[in-house]
Every structure is written in C-alpha cells, then in structure tokens.
C-alpha cells in the first residue's frame, strides 16, 4: 500500500472478512484480535440494495427524511449500533488491561505458564508484550469509527465519516485510580509520516 499507517504493537480488527484481509495487508505477519461487536450496521430490509433500488420506497424515504436517525426496517437504529460498538470498545480495553497485566507479570516472573490460560493466551494473538506496548491499531469499518468517535468526542455522527483506507489516530490516556480513559490529540491518518508511532 502507498498509504502511511502507524506501526502497531497490538492489532485489533472487526470480524468481517474485509477488515481481516485489510489488517493482513496493512500489518503483515500480525494476527489481529477480533472484536465481534465491530461488524457493520444491520441495514435490515435495506441490506444489499442501492439508492436506485430503494428510491420510491416509503420506508426508505422516511429514513432519509429522519437524517438517518430512524432504525432500519428489521435492522438496527443508530443508537443500537453505537451501543454495540461501544461495548466492543470496552471489550478492547479489557484485552488491553489483560495484555498489560500479563506483560507486567512476565517482567516480574509471575506469569502463569500452566494449563489454565485465558482465551487471549490460548490464541497466542499478541506478539509485542516483551518489548512494551507503545501503539495499538484497529482496522474497522467506517461506521464503527463514526459510532465510537461521535460517542466519545460528542460531535455529530457523520462528522467522522471516512473513505476506505482512511481513519484517525489519537492518544488514549489512562487515568490514575481507574475510570474511563480519555482520548487526546486526534488527527487524521493522512498526517502521519512513514513508521511514526503515536
């Protein structure tokens, strides 16, 4: 690829084939940790249809007139989609906590090498714990980007719309004493230079 993407010590991905294949192209040799909640929105009765096929459908016109806020017939609402993606983000944070704890325990010689292993340990999906984690990447659908950023940054959902191969980078700050980590210093990936970490 000619595009520039940040390096990733840990790689996450949505579970759909497009995300997994893209993750392998952008990060060859790394196996992403799949977050099942990061699938595309359920378009219900509109799934697989284009604008021409749906024009004239009263349900589609109601959805358009709502600015995309109504639920898709037999599908998800935007709010449901955002909640699902936020649940996936929280799962990603749990994985990160597990990875960091495992790394710290390994440094202290306390790492469990017995048969009682977590799903993450069994899958052997992480490769950079020993060197420390400096950067994490997630290969996801544009809708997941819009859902998560609008939820956490409070701006309009469509303000974060991206084209294929585009995305954002930011710094996640973990607060002393726990609590919800805060996102800082967002910028589009197009502002990166090759091999830069964030």
Predicted regions and their residues:
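Generic structural signal for well-ordered alpha-helical scaffold segments
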Residues: 2, 82, 86-97, 101
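Active-site signature of alpha/beta-hydrolase-fold catalytic machinery across serine-
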Residues: 25, 147-151
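Phosphate-handling substructures
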Residues: 26-86, 198
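Acidic, low-complexity terminal tails and accessory targeting/binding regions
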Residues: 44-52, 94, 98-103, 109-114, ...
């Amino acid at each position: 690829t000619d595009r520039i993407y940040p390096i990733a010590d840990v790689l996450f991905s949505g579970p759909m084939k497009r995300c997994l294949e893209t993750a392998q192209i952008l990060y060859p040799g790394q196996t992403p940790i799949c977050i099942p909640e990061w699938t595309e929105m359920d378009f219900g009765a509109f799934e697989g249809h284009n604008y021409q096929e749906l024009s004239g459908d009263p349900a589609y016109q109601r959805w358009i007139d709502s600015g995309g806020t109504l639920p898709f017939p037999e599908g998800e609402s935007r709010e449901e989609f955002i909640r699902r993606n936020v649940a996936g983000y929280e799962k990603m944070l749990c994985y990160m906590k597990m990875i960091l704890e495992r790394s710290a325990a390994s440094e202290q010689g306390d790492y469990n090498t017995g048969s009682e292993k977590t799903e993450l340990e069994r899958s052997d999906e992480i490769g950079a714990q020993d060197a420390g984690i400096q950067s994490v990447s997630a290969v996801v659908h544009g809708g997941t980007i819009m859902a998560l950023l609008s939820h956490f940054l409070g701006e309009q959902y469509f303000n974060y719309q991206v084209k294929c191969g585009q995305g954002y980078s930011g710094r996640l700050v973990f607060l002393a004493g726990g609590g919800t980590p805060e996102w800082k210093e967002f910028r589009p990936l197009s502002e990166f230079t090759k091999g830069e970490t964030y």
